[in-house]
């Protein structure tokens, strides 16, 4: 159970129980605590908070409307409980900080409309109008150190995608298509960051040890990596080849969305398990990560033997 500014919330779902209809008419609003089950999220709050402003909740708990309760006395409200704590805070304090993302403001607006919280409704509408003025706005941090990268990923509540590109790491010449493929990787990263910036943390790394490499993170740890470079012997000398594995990048980006928090409760572990996500295969994690590292190492060291090497082998 987690304390939330005077209210308590339990986010775990509760099994269905027998329900009955009751009325709160005549209850003392100054002292009575009530238990609310809002879409499976459980809240404790006071009658005073619920009846402080003229909203649907005041109508429910002042006797003007009947309410449903289960056998344990929880008041049942058939709405998503994600933003109900914000609704309660607004009713009690008259003000509340709004979420940053447009999607969450829209979700909160829908709840404010349902509960008839006029002041919060107007604030959400004003915030959305301001976002219409200034958006689209996409922030992509460029990391300055590995510690900064670790801190960004560890403190983010979103899955993360990092593109490392650093042409100066190359010891050899590039193959003919490498520059074009490098640009294609950068352009795809920019397009993905514009499309998913509200749901995924996108990070650029221009100081790492690789030349072109994608990394995908969920729940604060690396889930997958797509290395786009290899050393080849296509000519008489070594060359660095940069590839553009577009389909694989799209696949890993979509997979990383499975680690997105659902209704403030973290990723859906059942879905991760069904789709082979890391949460569903934690007991094989070390072995799988080791195999992935070996696979990446093999991909990075593809060698095509030179004609003179093949000649020596036949002698």
Curated annotation (Swiss-Prot):
GO annotation (BP), single: angiogenesis
Location in the cell: Nucleus
Modified residues (N-acetylmethionine): 1
Biological or metabolic pathway of the protein: Protein modification; protein ubiquitination
GO cellular component: Cul3-RING ubiquitin ligase complex; MKS complex; nucleus
Transcription recorded as keyword: no
Residues bearing the modification Phosphoserine: 23
Span of the annotated motif Interaction with PCNA: 239-245
GO molecular function: identical protein binding; Notch binding
Induction: By tumor necrosis factor/TNF in cells.
Domain BTB: 32-100
Annotated spans, Disordered: 269-294
UniProt KW keywords: Acetylation, Nucleus, Phosphoprotein, Ubl conjugation pathway
Tissue: Expressed at highest levels in lung. Also detected in testis and heart. Very low expression, if any, in brain, liver, spleen, kidney and skeletal muscle.
PANTHER family found in the cross-reference section: BTB/POZ DOMAIN-CONTAINING ADAPTER FOR CUL3-MEDIATED RHOA DEGRADATION PROTEIN FAMILY MEMBER, BTB_POZ DOMAIN-CONTAINING ADAPTER FOR CUL3-MEDIATED RHOA DEGRADATION PROTEIN 3
UniProt subunit comment: Homotetramer; forms a two-fold symmetric tetramer in solution. Interacts with CUL3; interaction is direct and forms a 5:5 heterodecamer. Component of the BCR(BACURD3) E3 ubiquitin ligase complex, at least composed of CUL3, KCTD10/BACURD3 and RBX1. Interacts with DNA polymerase delta subunit 2/POLD2. Interacts with PCNA.
Biological role stated in the UniProt entry: Substrate-specific adapter of a BCR (BTB-CUL3-RBX1) E3 ubiquitin-protein ligase complex. The BCR(BACURD3) E3 ubiquitin ligase complex mediates the ubiquitination of target proteins, leading to their degradation by the proteasome.
Family according to the record: Belongs to the BACURD family.
Annotated protein name in UniProt: BTB/POZ domain-containing adapter for CUL3-mediated RhoA degradation protein 3
């Amino acid at each position: 159970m987690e304390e939330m500014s005077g209210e308590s919330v339990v986010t775990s779902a509760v099994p269905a129980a027998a329900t009955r209809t009751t009325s709160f008419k005549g209850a003392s609003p100054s002292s009575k605590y009530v238990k609310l089950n809002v879409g499976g999220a459980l809240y404790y709050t006071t009658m005073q908070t619920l009846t402080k402003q003229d909203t649907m909740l005041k109508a429910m708990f002042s006797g003007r409307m009947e309410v449903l309760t289960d056998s344990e006395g929880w008041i049942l409200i058939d709405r998503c409980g994600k933003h109900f704590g914000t609704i309660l805070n607004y009713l009690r304090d008259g003000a509340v900080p709004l979420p940053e993302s447009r999607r969450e403001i829209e979700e909160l607006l829908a709840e404010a409309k349902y509960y008839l919280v006029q002041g919060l409704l107007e604030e959400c509408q004003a915030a959305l109008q301001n976002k219409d003025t200034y958006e689209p706005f996409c922030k992509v941090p460029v990391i300055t150190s590995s510690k900064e990268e670790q801190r960004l990923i560890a403190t983010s509540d979103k899955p993360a995608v990092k593109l490392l590109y650093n042409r100066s790491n190359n010891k050899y010449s590039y193959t003919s298509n490498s520059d074009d493929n490098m640009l294609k990787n950068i352009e795809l990263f920019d397009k993905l960051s514009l499309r998913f910036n509200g749901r995924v943390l996108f990070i650029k790394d221009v100081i790492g040890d690789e030349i072109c490499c994608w990394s995908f993170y969920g729940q604060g740890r690396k889930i997958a990596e797509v290395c786009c470079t290899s050393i080849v012997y296509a000519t008489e000398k070594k060359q660095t080849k940069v590839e553009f594995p577009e389909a694989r990048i799209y696949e890993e980006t979509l997979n990383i969305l499975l680690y997105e928090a659902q209704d403030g409760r973290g990723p859906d572990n059942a879905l991760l398990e069904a789709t082979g996500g890391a949460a569903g295969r934690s007991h094989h994690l070390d072995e799988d990560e080791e195999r992935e590292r070996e696979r990446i190492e093999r991909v990075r060291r593809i060698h095509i033997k030179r004609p003179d090497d093949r000649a020596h082998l036949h002698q």
